[in-house]
Amino acid sequence: MDLTIRPRTLRGDITIIPSKSQAHRLLICAALADRPTQLRCADTNRDIEATAECLRALGADIIRTETGYTVFPAARVPESAVLNCCESGSTLRFLLPIVGALGVDGVFQMEGRLPQRPLSPLWEEMERMGCSLSRPTATTLRCSGKLKPGSYSIDGSVSSQYITGLLFALSLIQGETSLEITGKTESKPYIELTKAAMALFDAPHYRSPGHIEVEGDWSNGAFFLAANELGSELS
């Protein structure tokens, strides 16, 4: 099959899809905040919805709106919860330490290939610091106990998602805590994204800004930025 490609410039306005990475983090911060948050998010996907559903299981009231989400923080943290992560590694790795910090007896449900994805060394560090983790079935993971204050350490060369989960968790623990990241840090920009989201909510106090918008996904926007460099006029 022969294809003919004719160069052409583009003009117009483009709405970039929202950053899934930031959406996860802002939903979590909003669920931990002191008052409701209007989260503007032009689009969603199954991973983001998994995080929202897990936060609902932890007591937050999250309402999908035409423009995004309205997040009402949990009035009371439940003693136990079932959290369906679907196939989202971010959801599992972010919320597992949070559940440990809150002292919730949590059962995480997993689908697809998520049960095969690694949790070490996060698993070992959480057990060292007070939690008990077990796999009752091939598709579920149980977390019980409560993380205690103290000095935490994690190998940064495995996954930045472990670090994000611990940053959230340690901000919730009463008492002096610290986190040492050893080795070469993997995907450092994602850690900075977590710190920026927490700063927007003034963590560890988690004061809601009221309204916030999920920024566009830069990896998706790169195509259009490249087009502008080649003569297109897109905004």
Q: How does the language model describe each region?
A:
Residues 1-235:
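Structural preference for solvent-exposed beta-strand-turn elements
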